[in-house]
Amino acid sequence: MASNKIIGIDLGTTNSAVAVLEGSTPKIIANKEGARTTPSVVAFKDGETQVGEVAKRQAITNPNTISSIKSHMGEAGYKVSVDGKDYTPQQVSAMILQHLKAFAEDYIGDTVEKAVITVPAYFNDAQRQATKDAGKIAGLSVERIINEPTAAALAYGLDKQDKDEKVLVYDLGGGTFDVSVLELGDGVFDVLSTNGDTHLGGDDFDQKIMDWLVAGFKEENGVDLSKDKMALQRLKDAAEKAKKDLSGVTEAQISLPFISAGENGPLHLEKSLSRAKFNELTADLVEKTRIPVQNALKDADLQASDIDVVILNGGSTRIPAVQEAVKSWTGKEPNHSINPDEAVALGAAVQGGVITGDVKDVVLLDVTPLSLGIETMGGVFTKLIDRNTTIPTSKSQVFSTAADNQPAVDIHVLQGERPMAADNKTLGNFQLTDIPAAPRGVPQIQVTFDIDKNGIVNVSAKDMGTNKEQKITIKSSDGLSDEEIEKMMNEAKENEEADKKRKEEVDTKNEVDQLLFQTDKTLKDVKGKVSDDEIKKAEDARDALKKAQEANNLDDMKAKKDDLTKIIQDLSVKLYQQAQSEAGDGNAAGADGATADADKKDDNTVDGDFHEVNDDDKK
């Protein structure tokens, strides 16, 4: 039976994390390497799928490595091709989720079927739906999709429910940026506004360093490293490391020997990057985050001075220039009480506890990040639900036909803030047919938008005259059907089984190697101490196992391994018993000798007088 626990997952662009509620406290679950975050990297090698640190480590030499897939979630038609097979962002994300799920299950000691997954607050409907699909493919029932800044606020405010505070969460991750303004009080987490940029994050800061290195190297050596895939991967790793180093030191050394080759032999890259130069290179990126901060405050109808607490979330907020900028804009020293890499997963676990009832007296009121509406006459975008409306919510509006005797209306569903439909994001299209013939403007068509607690949109159109209704649940723009998701789920399960089988094979082969080594050692130890027949029996079993190993017959290897293990165990027991017996005989002889020595003792004993010396007598 599966655990009733709901795990909290921060599915990040660069790194991901998973947490679970223990009692009333959320706890990060470390991965198998002992790290509290896991690189969001997937690699394919020799038919095996690798996820996390092991995938990231070999990215330089393996072209079949996928990173930052989150930046393509909900992107129509986007696929990654590996060895002739195409993978959608949902499938790749599902592999990361499966990996997190697996070590969470190891920690909990039970099967996990439910999760709360976080997304950037500024993710649109298609991106949210794609995230939910990824969870489904990974074998998880996604109980709730919540916004990352909101999750961070939950982690911060869980033990501060008696305080009334206005909180600004500045969330700069690996590939996305969000800012949310919340009001906390009496256990209610009320999101007042949210804003952001789904294509701005730490990866962009890395790219600035890479561009600087490429330009400098080209100027010095006449070689363009941007054309060399392997060199680019090395540059990316070095840029990321330099960025992290500059959070603690004022100058970082970048050393990449043998990065390329010129006419006179190998070329090496040696550079020093000062924090001041890094700040200069990335100043425009930091500045890009200012407008969303101002807009979020404006939408919440607040001034910067009204904010009580500023929370920094996301690894990129460790950059000193970012911290200084936020402090300058808000007039507040950022709160550092929560780990920016872990807060989102912890908050997701808290929300999981709210759903199961393990966390009491906490109410989360989130908002929709973008306005929703339909296209009307002249290509105009008519909003039905404004951005920053608390969800879940429902809104209806009555429209009519644009021509006489119009038999059908096309409903073009959009999300965005621009006045013209063409400038906004299309979520879907559907048609309401069989409208009775009538003059233009007479039919009454009621369009209703429903947004559920996950921010997923449902739209219906109803002819008020005939009560005929048509509904649509907005799917991700990848357009994954239920059948496609089902197929991907089955593939994911098959891959999981294949990975388990492959691991079992490797474990068995390792055990066989270890047993053969142990057998040779034991046979040397027992030589001359057990009968030749027993040694021959062990040697025959060893040779049979070697033959199964050479044939790579797994079942035969298991059987022969068990046979040899029993024989070697029996020999080891005999050897141990023999050693004990010899030790016992030796002890007995030693005891007799000791008695004899004791009898002789008086003949050579000299008694001595002694007296106590008092140190005070010497003074």
From Swiss-Prot:
Q: Does the keyword Ubl conjugation apply?
A: no
Q: PROSITE patterns of this UniProt entry?
A: HSP70_1, HSP70_2, HSP70_3
Listed GO MF terms: ATP binding; ATP-dependent protein folding chaperone; unfolded protein binding
The residue stretches assigned to a coiled coil in this entry are none
InterPro entries from the entry? ATPase_NBD (IPR043129), Chaperone_DnaK (IPR012725), Heat_shock_70_CS (IPR018181), HSP70_C_sf (IPR029048), HSP70_peptide-bd_sf (IPR029047), Hsp_70_fam (IPR013126)
Q: What induces it?
A: By stress conditions e.g. heat shock.
Tell me the keywords, alphabetical order: ATP-binding, Chaperone, Nucleotide-binding, Phosphoprotein, Stress response
Per its UniProt record, what Gene3D superfamilies does this chain match?
A: 1.20.1270.10, 3.30.420.40, Actin, Chain A, domain 4, Substrate Binding Domain Of DNAk, Chain A, domain 1
Positions of the UniProt region annotated as Disordered: 579-619
PANTHER family in the record, alphabetically? Answer: HEAT SHOCK PROTEIN 70KDA
Family as reported in the entry's similarity comment = Belongs to the heat shock protein 70 family.
The entry's function note states: Acts as a chaperone.
Protein name, entry field? Chaperone protein DnaK
- Show the taxonomic lineage: Bacteria, Bacillati, Bacillota, Bacilli, Lactobacillales
Q: Which gene encodes it?
A: dnaK
